[in-house]
Each structure stands twice: as C-alpha cells, then as structure tokens.
Curated annotation (Swiss-Prot):
Function statement: As part of the BLOC-one-related complex (BORC), it plays a role in the movement and localization of lysosomes at the cell periphery. Associated with the cytosolic face of lysosomes, BORC recruits ARL8B to the lysosomal membrane and couples lysosomes to microtubule plus-end-directed kinesin motors, driving lysosome movement toward the cell periphery.
Native source species: Homo sapiens (Human)
Lineage, broadest ranks: Eukaryota, Metazoa, Chordata, Craniata, Vertebrata
Effect of residue 29 to P: In NDOABA; likely pathogenic; decreased function in lysosome localization to peripheral cytoplasm; contrary to the wild type, the mutant does not fully rescue defects in lysosomal distribution in BORCS8-deficient cells
Protein name: BLOC-1-related complex subunit 8
Keywords for the protein's UniProt record, in alphabetical order: Disease variant, Intellectual disability, Lysosome, Membrane, Neurodegeneration, Phosphoprotein
Family assignment from sequence similarity: Belongs to the BORCS8 family.
Length: 119
C-alpha cells in the first residue's frame, strides 16, 4: 500500500511545483521585466525611425515651399505680360522717334513719326 500513496504524494508535489513555476513565469513583475526588455531593444530603432520621418517631413515642406514659390513667380510673369507688351510698344515708339530725330539732324526729311500710342 505504500506505493500508491507515494505516487499520490509525488503527483501532488509535481502539481504544486508546476503551479508554482507557472505562477512565477506569469507574475506581473516578470511580465513588466519582459516588457522593459522589449522596450529597451525596440526604442532605439523607433527613435531612429521618428528622426528619419521628421527629417523627411522638413525636406518635404521645403520642397513644397519651393514649388509654391516657383508657381507664384510663373503666375506673376504671366500676369505681367500686359506690362511687357506696353513696354515693347513704348520702346518701338522711342526707336522710331530716335530714327526720325537722326534723320532730321542729317538734313533729310523723313516721313512723319507715328503718333504716340495710348498703351
């Protein structure tokens, strides 16, 4: 009769031991320790990714500003085409008047200068 009783006691001891190991393995402090290990391993890589993303964001913002500025400059040039045409007309008129004055100074009688444009 000793043997079945010893087996029962041995089973109880192993069950208690297994339960103790399970409790120790899943104890909150062990879980927190494992979490801390994970964070310690992962944090440098995550910090590097964050720094990379911030740098890319700054570069993107700079590029966006440059493109917007260039678009604004092109739009302003297109809007000023009226003024360029006006200046061109005034320059042509000034050249014509100069030619007329040079011809008058040389004693020739050139045709009348064109009337000033109202551009």
């Amino acid at each position: 009769m000793e043997e079945p009783e010893m087996q029962l006691k041995g089973k109880k001891v192993t069950d208690k031991f297994t339960e103790s190991v399970y409790v120790l393995a899943n104890e909150p402090s062990v879980a927190l320790y494992r979490l801390q290990e994970h964070v310690r391993r992962s944090l440098p890589e995550l910090a590097q990714h964050k720094a990379d993303m911030q740098r890319w964001e700054e570069q993107s913002q700079g590029a966006i500003y440059t493109v917007e500025y260039a678009c604004s400059a092109v739009k302003n040039l297109v809007d000023s085409s009226v003024y360029f045409r006006s200046v061109e007309g005034l320059l042509k008129q000034a050249i014509s008047i100069r030619d007329h004055m040079n011809a008058s100074a040389q004693g020739h009688s050139p045709e009348e200068p064109p009337p000033p444009s109202s551009a």
